Amino acid sequence: MPFDIPVETLLIATLYLSLSVTYLLVLPAGLYFYLNNRWYVASSIERLVMYFFVFFLFPGMLLLSPFLNFRPRRREV
């Protein structure tokens, strides 16, 4: 067969693909929704942890930023 790829190679490729999808899509999307819910009520330590995760997941945040747009909530006057 021309496409006789060893099982170990397929396993490693699947592992790399799943880790990259998790790092670039799943974790940043979860962080976006968490930040949207907790931004105005977070304590100082929680805000520091949020800033760390934004720094850590920055490539995924850049990848998702054109599609997710969370504007501030409308104020009741």
From Swiss-Prot:
Listed GO MF terms: oxidoreductase activity, acting on NAD(P)H, quinone or similar compound as acceptor; quinone binding
Known catalytic reactions: a plastoquinone + NADH + (n+1) H(+)(in) = a plastoquinol + NAD(+) + n H(+)(out); a plastoquinone + NADPH + (n+1) H(+)(in) = a plastoquinol + NADP(+) + n H(+)(out)
Presence of keyword Thylakoid: yes
Transmembrane segments: 10-30, 48-68
Enzyme class, UniProt record, top EC level: translocase
Keyword annotations of the record: Membrane, NAD, NADP, Plastoquinone, Quinone, Thylakoid, Translocase, Transmembrane, Transmembrane helix, Transport
Any one annotated GO CC term: plasma membrane-derived thylakoid membrane
Protein's cellular compartments: Cellular thylakoid membrane
Domain of life: Bacteria
Membrane topology summary: Multi-pass membrane protein
EC number: 7.1.1.-
Family, similarity comment: Belongs to the complex I NdhL subunit family.
Subunit structure: NDH-1 can be composed of about 15 different subunits; different subcomplexes with different compositions have been identified which probably have different functions.
Function: NDH-1 shuttles electrons from an unknown electron donor, via FMN and iron-sulfur (Fe-S) centers, to quinones in the respiratory and/or the photosynthetic chain. The immediate electron acceptor for the enzyme in this species is believed to be plastoquinone. Couples the redox reaction to proton translocation, and thus conserves the redox energy in a proton gradient. Cyanobacterial NDH-1 also plays a role in inorganic carbon-concentration.
Protein name stated in the entry: NAD(P)H-quinone oxidoreductase subunit L
Organism: Picosynechococcus sp. (strain ATCC 27264 / PCC 7002 / PR-6) (Agmenellum quadruplicatum)
Chain's gene name: ndhL
